[in-house]
Amino acid sequence: MVADALSSHVDKWTAAEPELALALRFADAASRPRIAALICLEHEIVHAALHIAERDVALVKLNWWAEELAALAAGAARHPLTQTLGGNADLDAISPGQWGRAASAAMSMREAAPAATFQDLLARYRQFAECWAPMQQALYSAVDADAWIEARSLALALRDALALHHALQQDRLPLPMELLARHQLSRSELAQPSAARDAILREQISFLSRAMKAVKRSRLTVHAAVQLRADEYRCQRMHK
């Protein structure tokens, strides 16, 4: 039952992120279910934070996940994803407080004030990724946590920029204010298709692409490494 439910979640997120299937093929067979569950769990929480339009609905969903992460920490998980993660000594050693921060950081990411600079914007996603790094270290003891945080932050920033219209509907701005100022475009004008908006997005993609090239790759998780390469390819295609 749990295995079937996990497979359903993997199928769901593979449809949204095709490179996930490739990454899971390289995972050790014994640890593959937990690796898949952790990836899908984080994706579910990011989706609730950044892709549910109504704030109140997003908050209810995130509060539910916060309760479920607390249940996981207490050894009483109910959801198939958290049930799959239970029983691993390294994950079980993660404190309830850390799981709680992993959930609350998602809402903070949604409600962050507009960022002045590219680095300020990246810090928004980095704060979320930092809360999930200990879970990655629990499953990948050799992972470079700082490199994983940087790679995940850039992945989140790219997806948020590509979903610009959706973010604006939530009154969020996934681009730095300095970029709007440089192109002399207001937030309201950003909501309308235009050559100026296309130029802003190309510049943001260029920033992200350069930052991706600087990420240390030797000790990333398999999923982060595969996703990073796929995102670099996406940036190249969109920047043409």
Across the structure, where does each feature detected by a protein language model lie?
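Catalytic cores of Mg2+-dependent Asp-rich isoprenoid enzymes
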Residues: M1-G86, A102, Y125-P134, A138-K240
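Hydrophobic alpha-helical segments and helix pairs
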Residues: L85-W132
